[in-house]
Amino acid sequence: TYIYPAPDDFSSKQGDDIDPIEIGNVFGDAERAPKRAAQYVSQGFTAVKFDPIMPMSAFDPRQLSLSALANAELVVKNIREAVGDQCDLLIGTHGQPNAAGAIRLAQRLEPYYPLWLEEPVPPENVEEMARVARSTKIPVATGERLASKYEFATLFAKQAASIIQPALGR
């Protein structure tokens, strides 16, 4: 499976097993995001990747507010309703929440069956990522910001993720 960075109106399909697409600049918009996702599904895409809590401006992990959690859940719920079971939801958070916030987010998103929760906490916080992974049914994904075999070895030893996404150019 390949995930490609995408501009707002990315329209070509890529990938072998699934055809992922990033929803673009409709992060956190519970009305626009589902329409965009449905548009891509109608074009034959079978997965959409998006961050329902963007934009956050903090540089270090933080607790998500109740309103941010509610909006994220509404975004994911509306996208799931728009695409049904024809499309996988790939949830990315850019490692913005702290572990407690990521766990609260995951609990709210579980009913919508996302394929993964990518970088629920900063990837260098392996212990906290493992804590999140143990606390949710959603598979945790990470790896594109890890650069050495030692970082991956720690990730594996702590069972911090079930989907590994190495950036092979690193």
Residue ranges and their predicted role:
Residues 49, 67-68, 90-94, 113-123, ...:
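Catalytic beta/alpha-barrel core
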Residues 11, 128-131, 154:
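A short acidic, amphipathic alpha-helical/loop segment
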Residues 34, 126, 148-149:
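Structural motif corresponding to alpha-helix initiation and N-cap regions
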Residues 44, 107-115, 131-140, 156-164:
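Glycine-enriched alpha-helix->loop->beta-strand junction motifs that scaffold or abut catalytic
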Residues 1-90, 96, 103, 107-111:
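N-terminal capping/lid subdomain adjacent to the active-site entrance of alpha/beta enzymes
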Residues 48, 79, 92, 117, ...:
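Conserved, mostly hydrophobic/aromatic
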Residues 97-109, 147-159:
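Catalytic cores of alpha/beta
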